[in-house]
Amino acid sequence: KLWYFVTFIQSPPGFGKTSLLRIFYPTVLKKIVSHNTETRDVFEALNKLDVKDKNRIKRCAVYLLTRSDYALIDDEEMYSRAEQTSLFLALLNVRFVIATIKTLMRLTGVGSEDLYKIAYTPQDANILDAELDFPRTRCSCKDLLDWASEKEKEIYKAINSFEREGNSVFSCSSLFVLPLMNVQWFSYPGHTLCEEFIFQLDDAHKLTKEQRSTLEKVCIETRLNVTFWIAERLDNLVSSELLETDKQERDYQVIELDKYKDKKSIEFEKMVKLIANRRSTYAMADIDLMMLLANSDEGEWEQKYRAGAQKYLHKLSTNPEIRSYENLIKAIESIMDIKERAYNARALLMF
């Protein structure tokens, strides 16, 4: 039940949940080919999962990282619980539209100045139920981006305002954009897109308790009929907050990466193990920081971190695709702490 189903992916810190999600990025999937010995095993796993074949990408990620700013919405002095829920869902919706456009740009190679060339043609009557004045007729990705950007600004204005301006709270009760971001409704001349999007919400543990409860409730009650993966740290959950087992399998499933032994999904389990063991291979780096430091004596740690930092900074400085991050690279180079320099360089490289 990986496809067209809601899946909660839970793991302890550092077990590789984010690396697992990122393997489905369009840019990463393009690098995984059958004739490359370095990626052949991952390609075969993806092929068996019907994610990619030798000719094209079939499924790819629309990735959204949970930010800490969602917590700003939980202001009981400013908004009622219903209004907080509306703002939370509205913000998630507009950000998933932006994330979808980013995925389409990576699939097509289109830059932001040519987004008008990617057409969006909704074909389902459910478009009439869209909220937040979502575009209901044929338009371009440029139009969608303008809509989402403007709505995000309005939501931020409402969140950051110290005074209520009339009743201008956004009315939103569902994750309505997920089924509307149907890849079949997008087209780009001379380019074949994928068959399905995998919507991903990473670091969901950063949501407040009420927001996480709202997310779970919306996923169950709406029956989204999309592939939606929600990744969160297991250590942030207590037994009373874990998902209700009587609703699992029917409405959603839970995968604990450190315990996943479902024989019915053996191919996905293999995929999990591959990514956990090789989580750095597809991040443009040819050194795994954990392997670099593994089994080293305590007295050697500074030399190991220094070597790692130098390697990653060299990769960053020689990669033409990330020249726009020169200021960040300079800032990392100026970090005095060797360990912090290595980790920050690697983080930017993976990004």
Task: For each feature predicted by the language model, list its residue ranges.
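Hydrophobic anchor at the beta1->P-loop junction of P-loop NTPases
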Residues: 9
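The conserved Walker
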Residues: 13
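P-loop NTPase nucleotide-binding core
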Residues: 22-183, 248-351
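Short regulatory helix/loop adjacent to the ATP-binding pocket of P-loop NTPases
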Residues: 237-252
